[in-house]
């Protein structure tokens, strides 16, 4: 039986609140919107949080995933990846409009990384 431990960080949660637990989790989920409903705009400060978490993980030699959820779209995906997130949740950006075309756009951007 395999289980993964995840820590979710909502927008107002400072990185300092989760830092002591980074070596105890398999993944950190950074919420880039306030949780509750889809279609919200991406909170740009989330990129700084991802960068800070990635820097701490690298400094500790940890191979921990960083997932980002909320407002991710083709326009900000490259910045999200550059910041250090490696697991992406994109609901509205995929399912609004032509799903196949949206998936193709995401794969093209992710392929560059």
Residue ranges and their predicted role:
Residues 29-40, 83-103:
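Glycine-rich phosphate-binding active-site loops on the catalytic face of alpha/beta enzymes
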Residues 57-63, 111-113:
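Short helix-capping segments at alpha-helix termini
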Residues 28, 53, 69, 80, ...:
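Conserved, mostly hydrophobic/aromatic
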Residues 8-12, 33, 69-75, 93:
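Active-site beta-loop-alpha junctions enriched in small/polar residues
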Residues 8-46:
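Histidine/lysine/aspartate-rich catalytic loop segments that bind and position anionic ligands
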Residues 1-6:
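Short, small-residue-biased leader/transition segments that mark boundaries at the very start
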Residues 18, 47-54, 77, 103-107:
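Generic structural signal for well-ordered alpha-helices
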Residues 13-25, 70-88:
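Catalytic cores of alpha/beta
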């Amino acid at each position: 039986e395999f289980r993964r431990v995840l820590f979710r960080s909502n927008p107002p949660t400072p990185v300092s609140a989760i830092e002591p637990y980074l070596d105890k989790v398999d993944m950190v989920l950074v919420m880039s919107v306030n949780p509750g409903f889809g279609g919200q705009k991406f909170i740009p400060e989330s990129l700084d949080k991802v960068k800070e978490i990635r820097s701490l993980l690298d400094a500790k030699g940890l191979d921990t995933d960083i997932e980002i959820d909320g407002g991710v779209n083709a326009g900000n995906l490259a910045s999200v990846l550059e910041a250090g997130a490696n697991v992406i949740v994109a609901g509205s950006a995929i399912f609004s409009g032509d799903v196949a075309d949206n998936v193709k756009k995401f794969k093209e951007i992710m392929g560059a990384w």
